[in-house]
Design a protein with these regions (language model features):
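Beta1/beta-strand and adjacent pyrophosphate-binding region of the FAD-binding site
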Residues: 1-14, 30
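Short alpha-helical segment within the catalytic ATP-binding CA
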Residues: 16-17, 49
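Conserved functional loop/turn residues at catalytic and ligand-binding sites
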Residues: 10, 26, 59
Length: 119
């Protein structure tokens, strides 16, 4: 039986990110995922500049950027259309070297993370 340094259960965005970070640092990684393919609809839709730094470390930003949108803000409305929270986001690069807010399609991210693991 082969031994692994790390076992990760689930290959969603968190599991895929962790697997890439461990592999990048020389750990052998066993990934357990019950689904044959990723779920085709989005669930997570937002991340910030700190997460983009992690993706930069992994090495997926060049390919993944074309699937992201710089988020200018979010308005939350109630059932009558009244704005209950307006959350504008600055559109300038932060000290982390990235914009403070991005929108994305989760299946695109999962595809990029899995592609990187195959290399």
């Amino acid at each position: 039986m082969k031994e692994y340094d790390v076992t990760i259960v689930g290959l969603g965005p968190t599991g895929g990110t962790l697997a890439n970070l461990f592999a990048l640092n020389g750990f052998s990684v066993l990934i357990l995922e019950r689904e044959k393919s990723f779920y085709p609809l989005p669930r997570a839709v937002h991340f910030d500049d700190e997460v983009m730094r992690v993706f930069q470390t992994i090495g997926i930003t060049n390919d993944f950027l074309k699937y992201t949108i710089i988020n200018k803000g979010t308005k939350f409305v109630n059932s009558k259309g009244k704005v209950i929270l307006d959350w504008p986001r600055p559109r300038k690069v932060t000290e982390n070297g990235w914009y403070p807010s991005y929108r994305f399609n989760q299946p695109d991210l999962e595809r990029q993370l899995r592609k990187k693991l195959m290399k």
